[in-house]
């Protein structure tokens, strides 16, 4: 027995006290603890190092891959170890030999291999290596005391969540048996401290990209082992910045060791940025660690370190992580190492290389301004020593400044486009461009430009101070251009200098002038070196008011006496009236002759003066003359016209031909009524029966009309009406149309051969033949004048002179009478015949007797020249012809005519072309300009000298009236009702007649910035198709036209303007705009042609480009030549330059001349320019422009062998200006003032009744209207 006990004790001694380990880790209630059983490694671990490379480990059997979290560099974080007392303390050695049973609750971890054993006889202490955060091992402590095989229990506690995971030791342990028995009982031994046993345990954190969490491994001096397969040494899916407690327990030590795990944040939360402001980047550096917004870790545990070279200074920063370095060297490289620390252990490290920016350049050592002219100066300088990339040169005059950016390799610059006699300061500095542009200090130099010619004075006004004294005031010119300011006034009358004044202020009082005399006042500005161009204003003195009072007293006395005489005569006539009809008739006849007054013939040199005298006082003298002419001479019977069979052949019952001179037709089959037609023979000037005045044919009398044409051998028919006027039938259409070809009128066959439409008339070539006569057919020319308005008379008497030229071109000596008819055959017919006959008298005898000839017309046909306005129109046509003569030229004769016009004979006299230009009326102030000169509208005018006349300005509606009708129907409606001055807005634009009269153009100034919206409203309301822009936006530093378009969509009130397309050519830019109105459904397309070769000069540099531009514009316009005079005030084309006159006038004139040449093969430069001047002030204002029009037309239409050869637009256009500047100044005399137009209302004489209810007498449609007076030069 003793022996067996001895063997048992010996066996127990061999196994050692640690064969049975009863260590179960205990934790606080509520914590979930995981115990991991580890076996000690037999191999010692290497010593701890501070540098490591995070490995990729795989400790699971399934080959899953994990990546260490800290890429790029390594550091070891020492674990925070908190001891915890062991819950079980064995009291005796024998307790270790007890067999324990425990159920292990293990997480899924990979077990360490268990095949390693300790060397015999060497006691070993179990260690658990811990790596934090990236796997850097820490040295394990080894014990020299022998130790039996044991197990360690590891418990982990999630501090933040309270979960307790426990892995207990296995309850049953195997041990080695020995046959040796011993009765010796092992004495109990004291256990070592677990802090010492697990002192070298480290924690290694590994970031898992797939789960976005950390895995923690426990490591020590020796690789830990697990005795059983369900033992764990790795914790997975730890969120960043979370905390856990790990409890290490082992039966060989007491108490258990607790490790607090503090999981670090991921490096993706940190971003190193350069926060240096650009402006400070040359001497400062700013680096900042940015933390993501959703950062949940304790910011107090984060710290930062920076170390920058070349200074090699280290900067420890607080939680803000921003580094500022100041006073650094410019353009120098710096390298900074930036570190992020977590619990004072390096978590992330980055190197950042930063270069400071360029420094500010130095001031230029020398700047000089020299060689100044009146518009330029030369600036030179020396290069600075510091680094620079270029120069900026600024030159200024108060308050404006303009700068130029110059290259680095220049050292001089010529400043251009300066104002004369102006102080300028030039500032020059160098600059360098890095992260920002840095400008060096400026170096200045001052200079003054030289003097130049001044501009015209502004705001010149003349007014009467008394009957024979005039006040003249003005303002200084915009451009003085010199050191002094003197005003010189010249007073002229009839081209002769009367007085001269010279003073420092522009306030003159010119007295002691002649009464009722026209004067011209010319004001020059002198700046001390140069004399400017004159500003000219006409002004007339008044009559002598004192003498007028005496005259009025005398007139009252004479009038009173005359009134008494008239009353007596009336009484006497009534007393002598007889009841006998024959005696009454005899008395009337005597009275008709007696009521005529004595009017002397007018000589050509007194024609204008006589006209002025008679038109004065609302045409009182003209009215007296006209009313003295009997409407009907009753001594001439009209029995044939009143016969019953003839009454239906008369259009009006009271407009009948006299029996003695009516046109008699051949009798048909004994029918006496077949000889009648309402037509009369009319004598011309010393040529009997030159004309036949007829009524407009009715449907019932068309056959008789052609019978008259055939029998009278007439070859020219002049029709001075339209078939319908004002919805009233005026004349039957008695000729075949081109589609019809031929029409038969009883025995006369009429064939139309040609039809040509011109603006004011239509020419048709007809052939007539008689069925029953063997005589050959005849050619008949039918000319229909279409420009006579429904009411009144033509505004321009030149139109009737032009009609006369066309008629005379087709008439010859062998022709029969010229047949002239309107509707009734008296009013317009008599007017045309009167003009034709009196012009023959003027050409033959140099005098005219208009009154006497009209009396003779009335003796041949009643009511000839039916109303007073027609009577005055005859005088106006004579004045027009006498003043201006024939200025129309055929294209085939243009070259020879132009050569003669340019000849000087003698050389000192003006050429005929210059004399023709001098005869052009200026039309200054011939119409009112009240609207444009109102105070609220003055700011809308670019020039006070170019203000539209009231009668033809373009009014703007305040709101577009939307009609329920379609837009096509609204186009046909007239706009005149809505164009009243009271309800319309103002814009500086005028209607200008185009060659095709009803189709008007608009001449406008370049829009101001504040009138761009009005400009587009005008385009929309007037249905403009094409805009012609003849100016640049800027002239020097002065705006001459606001840019009224932009990229994309522009909105102006209810208008939207969209630039759709842009095309550029060598001569112009074509833009297409789409206009939309909020109250209109359909958009409109408007084309803009911007001329780029006319740079503001008076004449275009490339005339052929202007012709090409016009040809291209015409392709965009609707087809011209509409019949009728319906006046819509719509314009297909709008032309504008700076002021709407200088370049616009030349363009409009050339546009109309080209149309005239293409349509009629004639040009009339004089009349075209005269018409434009009547429409807008300042149109074609120089002789150079006037001569240019002749030259360009001659170049476009050269002649070869007497035939016109039309030139291509690409052909070279040459001009020969034979007038030098000095001679022109001497030869161009300013025309005198135009006369005022007569009043528009006068009363017609008598009344007529229509023959049928559907027709009215002619004079009701031709009611008196004011004549359009032609002003004189």
Curated annotation (Swiss-Prot):
Which residues are recorded as modified (Phosphotyrosine)?
652
Residues recorded with modification Phosphoserine: 944, 963, 966, 970, 973-974, 978, 1209, 1266
Matching InterPro entries, A to Z?
FN3_dom (IPR003961), FN3_sf (IPR036116), Ig-like_fold (IPR013783), Prot-tyrosine_phosphatase-like (IPR029021), Protein-Tyr_Phosphatase (IPR050348), PTP_cat (IPR000242), PTP_recept_N (IPR024739), Ptprc (IPR016335)
The active site annotation covers: 822 (phosphocysteine intermediate), 1137 (phosphocysteine intermediate)
Q: Which residues form the Fibronectin type-III domain?
A: 361-452, 453-545
Glycosylated residues in this chain: 62, 142, 153, 164, 178, 200, 245, 250, 271, 282, 327, 333, 371, 374, 471, 502
What GO terms describe the biological role, i.e. biological process, of this protein?
alpha-beta T cell proliferation; B cell differentiation; B cell proliferation; B cell receptor signaling pathway; bone marrow development; cell cycle phase transition; defense response to virus; dephosphorylation
Can you quote a single GO CC term? external side of plasma membrane
Which locations, inside or outside the cell, does it occupy?
Cell membrane; Membrane raft; Synapse
Which leading EC class covers this enzyme?
A: hydrolase
Quaternary structure and interacting proteins, as annotated: Interacts with SKAP1. Interacts with DPP4; the interaction is enhanced in an interleukin-12-dependent manner in activated lymphocytes. Binds GANAB and PRKCSH. Interacts with CD53; this interaction stabilizes PTPRC on the membrane and is required for optimal phosphatase activity. Interacts with CLEC10A.
The record's domain comment reads: The first PTPase domain interacts with SKAP1.
The protein, known as: Receptor-type tyrosine-protein phosphatase C
Q: Which organism is it from?
A: Rattus norvegicus (Rat)
Please state the gene responsible for encoding this protein: Ptprc
């Amino acid at each position: 027995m003793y022996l067996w006990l001895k063997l048992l004790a010996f066996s127990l001694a061999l196994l050692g006290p640690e064969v049975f380990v009863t260590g179960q880790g205990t934790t606080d209630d509520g914590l979930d603890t995981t115990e991991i059983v580890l076996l000690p490694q037999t191999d010692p671990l290497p010593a701890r190092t501070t540098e490591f490379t995070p490995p990729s480990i795989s400790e699971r059997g399934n080959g899953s891959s994990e990546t260490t979290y800290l890429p790029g560099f390594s550091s070891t974080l020492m674990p925070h170890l908190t001891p915890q007392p062991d819950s079980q303390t064995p009291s005796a050695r024998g307790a270790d030999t007890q067999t324990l049973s425990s159920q292990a609750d293990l997480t899924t971890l990979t077990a360490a291999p268990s095949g390693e054993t300790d060397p015999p006889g060497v006691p070993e202490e179990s260690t658990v290596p811990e790596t934090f955060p990236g796997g850097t091992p820490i040295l394990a402590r080894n014990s020299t005391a022998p130790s039996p095989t044991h197990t360690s229990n590891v418990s982990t506690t999630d501090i933040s969540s309270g979960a307790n995971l426990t892995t207990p030791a296995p309850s049953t342990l195997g041990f080695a048996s020995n046959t040796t028995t011993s009765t010796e009982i092992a004495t109990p031994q004291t256990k070592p401290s677990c802090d010492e046993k697990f002192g070298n345990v480290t924690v290694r954190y590994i970031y898992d990209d797939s789960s976005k969490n950390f895995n923690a491994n426990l490591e020590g001096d020796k690789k830990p082992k697990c005795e059983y397969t369900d033992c764990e040494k790795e914790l997975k899916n730890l969120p960043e910045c979370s905390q856990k407690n790990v409890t290490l327990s082992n039966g060989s030590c007491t108490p258990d060791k607790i490790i607090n795990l503090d999981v670090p944040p991921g490096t993706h939360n940190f971003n190193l940025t350069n926060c240096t402001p650009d402006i400070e980047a040359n001497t400062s550096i700013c680096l900042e660690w940015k933390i993501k917004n959703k950062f949940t870790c304790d910011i107090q545990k984060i710290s930062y370190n920076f170390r920058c070279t070349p200074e090699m200074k280290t900067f420890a920063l607080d939680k803000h992580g921003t580094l500022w370095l100041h006073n650094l060297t410019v353009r120098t490289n710096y390298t900074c190492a930036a570190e992020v620390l977590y619990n004072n252990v390096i978590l992330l490290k980055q190197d950042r290389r930063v270069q400071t920016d360029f420094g500010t350049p130095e001031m230029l050592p020398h700047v000089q301004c020299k060689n100044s002219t009146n518009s330029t100066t030369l600036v030179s300088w020396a290069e600075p020593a510091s680094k620079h990339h270029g120069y900026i040169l600024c030159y200024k005059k108060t308050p404006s400044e303009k700068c130029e950016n110059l290259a680095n390799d220049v050292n001089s610059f010529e400043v251009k486009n300066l104002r004369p006699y102006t102080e300028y300061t030039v500032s020059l500095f160098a600059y360098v461009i890095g992260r920002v542009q840095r400008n060096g200090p400026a170096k200045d130099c001052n200079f003054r430009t030289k003097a130049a010619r001044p501009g015209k004075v502004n705001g010149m006004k003349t007014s009467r101070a008394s009957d024979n004294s005039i006040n003249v005031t003005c303002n200084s010119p915009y451009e003085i251009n010199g050191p002094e300011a003197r005003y010189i006034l010249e007073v002229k009358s009839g081209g002769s200098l009367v007085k001269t004044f010279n003073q420092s202020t522009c306030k003159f009082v010119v007295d002691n002038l002649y009464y009722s005399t026209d004067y011209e006042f010319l004001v020059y500005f002198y700046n001390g070196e140069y004399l400017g161009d004159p500003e000219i204003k006409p002004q007339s003195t008044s009559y002598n008011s004192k003498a007028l009072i005496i005259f009025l007293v005398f007139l009252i006395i004479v009038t009173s006496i005359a009134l008494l005489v008239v009353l007596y005569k009336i009484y006497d006539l009534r007393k002598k009236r007889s009841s006998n009809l024959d005696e009454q008739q005899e008395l009337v006849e005597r009275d008709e002759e007696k009521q005529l007054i004595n009017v002397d013939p007018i000589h050509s040199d007194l024609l204008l003066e006589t006209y002025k005298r008679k038109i004065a006082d609302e045409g009182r003298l003209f009215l007296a003359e006209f009313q003295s002419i009997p409407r009907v001479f009753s001594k001439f019977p009209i029995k044939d016209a009143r016969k019953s069979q003839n009454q239906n052949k008369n259009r009006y019952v009271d407009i009948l031909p006299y029996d003695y001179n009516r046109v008699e037709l051949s009798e048909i089959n004994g029918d006496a009524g077949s000889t009648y037609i309402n037509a009369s023979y009319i004598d011309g000037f010393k040529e009997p029966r030159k004309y036949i005045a007829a009524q407009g044919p009715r449907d019932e009398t068309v056959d008789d009309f052609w019978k008259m044409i055939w029998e009278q051998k007439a070859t020219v028919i002049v029709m001075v009406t339209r078939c319908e006027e004002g919805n009233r039938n005026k004349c039957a259409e008695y000729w075949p149309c081109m589609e019809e070809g031929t029409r038969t009128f009883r025995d006369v066959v009429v064939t139309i051969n040609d039809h040509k439409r011109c603006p004011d008339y239509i020419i048709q070539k007809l052939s007539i033949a008689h069925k029953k006569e063997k005589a050959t057919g005849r050619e008949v020319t039918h000319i229909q004048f279409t420009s006579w308005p429904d009411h009144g008379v033509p505004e321009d008497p030149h139109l009737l002179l032009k009609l006369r030229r066309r008629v005379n071109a087709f008439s010859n000596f062998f022709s029969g009478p010229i047949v002239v008819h309107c509707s009734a055959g008296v009013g317009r017919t008599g007017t045309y015949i009167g003009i034709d006959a009196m012009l023959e008298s003027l050409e033959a005898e140099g005098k005219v007797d208009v009154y006497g000839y009209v009396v003779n017309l009335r003796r041949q046909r009643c009511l000839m020249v039916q109303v007073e306005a027609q009577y005055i129109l005859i005088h106006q046509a004579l004045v027009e012809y006498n003043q201006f003569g024939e200025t129309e030229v055929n294209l085939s004769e243009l070259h020879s005519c132009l050569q003669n016009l340019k000849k000087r004979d003698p050389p000192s006299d003006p050429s005929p072309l210059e004399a023709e230009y001098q005869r052009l009326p200026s039309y200054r102030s011939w119409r009112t300009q009240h609207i444009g000169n109102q105070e609220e509208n003055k700011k809308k005018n670019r020039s006070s000298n170019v203000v539209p006349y009231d009668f033809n300005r373009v009014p703007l509606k305040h709101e577009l009236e939307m009609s329920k009708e379609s837009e096509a129907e609204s186009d046909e409606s007239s706009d005149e009702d809505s164009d009243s001055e009271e309800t319309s807005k103002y814009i500086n634009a005028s209607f200008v007649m185009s060659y095709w009269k009803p189709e008007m153009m608009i001449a406008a100034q370049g829009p101001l910035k504040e009138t761009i919206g009005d400009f587009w409203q005008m385009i929309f309301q007037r249905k403009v198709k094409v805009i012609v822009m003849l100016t640049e936006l800027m002239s020097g530093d002065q705006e001459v036209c606001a840019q009224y378009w932009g990229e994309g969509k522009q909105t102006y009130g209810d208008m939207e303007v969209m630039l759709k397309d842009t095309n550029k050519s060598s001569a112009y830019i074509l833009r297409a705009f789409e206009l939309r109105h909020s109250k209109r459904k359909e958009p409109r397309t408007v084309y803009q042609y911007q001329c780029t070769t006319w740079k503001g000069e008076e004449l275009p540099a490339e005339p052929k480009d202007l012709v090409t531009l016009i040809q291209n514009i015409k392709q965009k316009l609707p087809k011209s030549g509409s019949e009728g005079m319906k006046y819509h005030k719509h314009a297909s084309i709008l032309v504008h330059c700076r002021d709407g006159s200088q370049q616009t006038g030349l363009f409009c004139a050339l546009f109309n001349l080209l149309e005239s040449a293409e349509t009629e093969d004639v040009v009339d430069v004089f009349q075209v320019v005269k018409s434009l001047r009547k429409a807008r002030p300042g149109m074609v204002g120089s002789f150079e422009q006037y001569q240019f029009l002749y030259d360009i037309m001659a170049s476009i239409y050269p002649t070869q062998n007497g035939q016109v050869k039309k030139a291509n637009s690409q052909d070279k256009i040459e001009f020969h200006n034979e007038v030098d500047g000095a001679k022109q100044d001497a030869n161009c005399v300013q025309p005198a003032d135009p006369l005022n137009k007569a009043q528009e209302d006068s009363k017609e004489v008598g009344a007529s009744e229509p023959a049928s209810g559907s027709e009215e007498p002619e004079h009701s449609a031709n009611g008196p209207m004011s004549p359009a007076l032609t002003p004189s030069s």
